[in-house]
Amino acid sequence: MGNIRQGDVWFVEAAPVPGGGTVGNEIWSGRPAVIVSNDSINQRSGVVQVVYLTSPNKQRRTNTINPTVHVNRRESIAVCNQVANVDKSRLTSRISHVEDHELEAIQNGIAIALDLN
């Protein structure tokens, strides 16, 4: 596995969940995610923090908490109100890296979702 950096977009391998998959509006693995943990944690820890990406649709629209990002020219929504911890072994392939302004929008969305302002 290569160097994992904040702002990278990685595919996160699906985790088997006993009794089924997600419940309600949960987002889970088996999809791309943006690494949001800082680079020091990314180098030293076996776990990283991610924000999963999803396709825009009627239920999930872009807003201050869930900004739009572009990965390989495709529009996705960063689901910032569902930050997840992921073991590095689940990161299967690096897809891209978000633009600086997109990472800033994600960080702002997390701060709003967690009331860190």
Regions found by a protein language model. Name each.
Residues 1-117:
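Conserved functional hotspots at enzyme active or ligand-binding sites that engage polyanionic ligands
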